[in-house]
Swiss-Prot record:
Residues 7-16 have a biased composition (Basic residues). Keywords: Ribonucleoprotein, Ribosomal protein. InterPro entries: Ribosomal_bL32, Ribosomal_bL32_bact, Ribosomal_zn-bd. Belongs to the bacterial ribosomal protein bL32 family. This is Large ribosomal subunit protein bL32. The keyword Transmembrane does not apply. It comes from Hahella chejuensis (strain KCTC 2396). NCBIfam families: rpmF_bact.
Amino acid sequence: MAVQQNRKSRSRRGMRRSHDALSSAALSIDPTTGEKHRRHHVTPDGFYRGKKVVEVSQD
């Protein structure tokens, strides 16, 4: 098993963890409907980059 040879300081531990934070999803506003959606994803009503690409059922 891997066992550390020397104890790591709080500073080194913090520097290692500095990249672990989660960022929020980037949101865009659809130009045709004004609806918020995730970048590079189809909106819930089926539009992508201003064009209807998916037929959404009205269940």
